[in-house]
Amino acid sequence: MNKLQEIDQEITYWYRERLKLLHPLRQLFWECTLRCNMACRHCGSDCKTVSNVPDMPFEDFTPVLDEVRLHQPHIKTMVFTVGGEPLVRKDIIECGRTITEKGFLWGMVSNGKLIDSYMMNELSDAGLRSLAVDVDGLRDTHNWLRNDNNSFDVVYNAIGHIKKAPHLIWDVITCVNSRNISQLEEIKRMLIEAGVTKWRCFSIVPMGRAKDDEELVLSNSQYRYLMDFIVKTRMEGKIQLSYACEGYLGDYEGLVRRSHFLCSAGLTTASVLSDGSISGCLSIRSNYHQGNIYKDDFWNVWQNRFDKYRNREWMRSGECADCKVFKYCQGNGMHLRNNDGSLMFCNYNKLFNSK
């Protein structure tokens, strides 16, 4: 790590300490449905076409929006509708329109299957400002991961409609696994030719359907290759590639994404799950819920709970007990913790302390 990286790392540490005290809510995720029109191999939520958990009525979520707007009117909070697949909700356009009318920025994460010209126009007219869609490889590897032989063609067509939308910040997400990692150069060329300017690469966490699927999890050498590929691509400057927000990456910090690692869950990010549970980010599938909107005042929960998120000293156990980089890592992302507090895996060790 060079001197500039070390300085940025210290700045990030003190910035995190400040956020622990202030915790401004900048991102609010609403799990608006657990229904999905796909059955992806890596789904962390194990979503299905018909969910055992009904969609939350939008009128149950709107009081949360009103509380947030009342208590921090000066902050432009981004509200993300996620699932499942949010576009399977018949009222999603009206939900987004109301979110926008209440003074929030509206964002969405979608598999792209239902995005055509008409849908994109409807989303834009309702105020959509941020959108992420998935392209998980070339045709064969994308369709394999998505368990759908038509998925690649559909999402590729969707990109053509998305890039025409005005005032929209959008990017493509690729979940990198052992099948598509050898295709990264080809995927990069394909995305650039399709007019994609922003690209994010994720590694797959062993949870949900991916828990026991070894093909989805990168080996240590593959993980290092991914980091080196991102560094090289960022230096080329042909497409804005970054690694996902998960995990402390040691010497790669500041090189594979715009800022150094900082798990924003409970600091600037909260989520309302489909059953009303209040949590950090929706990538957290373990039970670190802090309350429920059907029983608790959301803003009171945000202000006065979330101690496990804001004070990470409880994570100094197991492989984190004597870790020399704990000050900067803070026990890794909350989504990488099991219910018992143990760490699923360590990004830093995967990169630097493996044989």
Please provide the spans of the model-predicted regions:
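Conserved N-terminal glycine/acidic-rich loop preference
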Residues: 2-31, 41-42, 89-91, 95, ...
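Flexible mid-to-C-terminal extensions adjoining Fe-S/redox cofactors in radical SAM and related proteins
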Residues: 4-19, 23-24, 283-355
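Radical SAM/AdoMet-radical enzyme domain recognition
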Residues: 58-81, 89-204, 215-219
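Residue-level recognition of short loop/turn positions
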Residues: 39, 83, 273-275
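Cys/His-rich metal-chelating microdomains
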Residues: 35, 39, 43-46, 266, ...
